[in-house]
């Protein structure tokens, strides 16, 4: 006997230090052989020293982070075409897209929970965020989330994702909802 829902994380599929830890294969097995429902989050990291990062370079995982106070990555620029931050985010999405596409080809739906708990400690300006994706506040976060959604569905044709929004604090979650 197995639980109905099992959680996975696509954090290791990224352009910095990514390695194949067989997450996708385990998701497919869970959905096809055990008739389970996979849920997947995405703890995507950024270089701690983004200013000196060259797009496409590999970076040791210890020099990467998801914490907003450990990086100079400017989240507000991640939604502005032509910036290095935007190009980095688009590269991470491209790297990610290969994995849910394989799961889609296997006929398995995924509950996908990207950019979760962005607001952190109940505010809308990003000052209490736990993750870089919430660092620039609710309005930037919503655009970043929609950028991911649009790119995966329209550019990469991924339609097996059931999109889950996950906030931390109910009192501010309506302001952060994409």
Map each language-model feature to its residues:
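A short, well-structured beta->alpha microelement
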Residues: 1, 169-170
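Flexible loop/turn segments at secondary-structure boundaries
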Residues: 14-15, 171-173
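Short, solvent-exposed polar/charged micro-motifs at secondary-structure junctions
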Residues: 50-51, 173-175
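N-terminal regions that are enriched for targeting/export leaders
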Residues: 1-13
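Short His-Asn-centered micro-motif
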Residues: 8-9, 41, 113-115, 164-168
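Aromatic- and acid-rich polysaccharide-binding/catalytic face
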Residues: 6, 174-178
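Substrate-binding cleft of extracellular glycoside hydrolase catalytic domains
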Residues: 15-18, 23-154, 158
């Amino acid at each position: 006997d197995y639980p109905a829902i099992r959680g996975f994380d696509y954090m290791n599929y990224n352009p910095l230090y990514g390695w194949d830890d067989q997450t996708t294969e385990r998701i497919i097995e869970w959905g096809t052989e055990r008739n389970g429902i996979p849920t997947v989050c995405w703890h995507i990291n950024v270089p701690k020293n983004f200013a000196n990062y060259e797009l496409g370079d590999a970076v040791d995982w210890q020099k990467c982070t998801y914490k907003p106070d450990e990086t100079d990555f400017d989240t507000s620029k991640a939604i502005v075409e032509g910036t290095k931050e935007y190009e980095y985010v688009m590269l991470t999405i491209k790297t990610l897209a290969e994995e849910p596409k394989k799961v889609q080809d296997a006929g398995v739906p995924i509950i996908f929970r990207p950019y979760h708990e962005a607001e952190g400690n109940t505010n809308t300006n990003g000052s209490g965020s736990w993750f870089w994706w919430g660092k620039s506040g609710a309005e930037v976060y919503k655009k970043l989330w929609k950028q991911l959604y649009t790119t995966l569905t329209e550019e990469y044709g991924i339609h097996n994702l059931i999109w889950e929004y996950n906030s931390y604090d109910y009192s501010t979650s309506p302001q952060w909802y994409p």
